[in-house]
């Protein structure tokens, strides 16, 4: 990207900040979301890319190579997976909702809080699922397969592309 857009700013999980920090354009990239899954040959991993212009999300792409799923969201166009429009769930009663989650990095302060919330969610919802790649779990919310998602300490590269995808999917609800 730096060769094609030398005046843009890039924030990447793996390589940090690059380019012009005051650029109108910023790319937020997670080149491998679900690293542990990838290393264990589990298909739940993805590449996630978001483009911001003047601080506003404009384009998002999430690709799950093993599943051959390409999620694309564009302002004014909506959100799609492999050219099929995404629509979020209409469920709004918590006891009927299927919720996704991710486990935070083990931390003596956060782990007990997370486990308490997880226990409450397991009691209050139709079920909780953990698949190991935040971007793809959140894509399940955009698809209407999950009704919500919670996780602690997510970073911009974990959620930038998928949050935009979710917003565009919500527009077509």
Please place each PLM-identified region on the residue numbering.
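Residue-level signal for inorganic ion chemistry
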Residues: 1, 35, 64, 73, ...
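Flexible, acidic active-site loops/lids enriched in D/E/S/T/G that coordinate Mg2+ and/or position polar
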Residues: 1-54, 61
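Acidic beta-strand-loop-alpha-helix segment within the catalytic core
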Residues: 49-138
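Alpha-to-beta junction loops
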Residues: 143-148
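Acidic, divalent-metal-coordinating active-site segment for phosphoryl/phosphodiester hydrolysis
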Residues: 160-163
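Conserved small/polar residues in nucleotide/adenosyl-binding loops
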Residues: 165-172
């Amino acid at each position: 990207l730096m060769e094609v857009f030398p005046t843009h700013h890039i924030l990447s999980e793996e390589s940090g900040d690059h380019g012009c920090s005051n650029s109108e354009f910023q790319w937020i990239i997670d080149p491998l979301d679900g690293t542990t899954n990838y290393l264990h040959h589990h298909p739940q991993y993805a590449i996630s890319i978001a483009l911001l212009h003047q601080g506003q999300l404009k384009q998002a792409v999430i690709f799950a190579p093993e599943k051959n799923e390409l999620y694309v969201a564009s302002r004014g166009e909506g959100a799609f997976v492999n050219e099929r429009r995404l629509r979020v769930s209409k469920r709004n009663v918590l006891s009927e909702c299927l919720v996704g989650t991710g486990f935070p990095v083990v931390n003596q302060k956060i782990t007990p809080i997370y486990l308490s919330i997880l226990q409450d969610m397991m009691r209050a919802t139709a079920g909780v699922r953990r698949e190991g790649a935040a971007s793809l779990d959140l894509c399940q919310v955009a698809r209407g397969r999950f009704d919500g998602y919670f996780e602690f300490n997510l970073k911009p590269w974990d959620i930038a592309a998928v949050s935009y995808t979710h917003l565009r999917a919500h527009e077509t609800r």
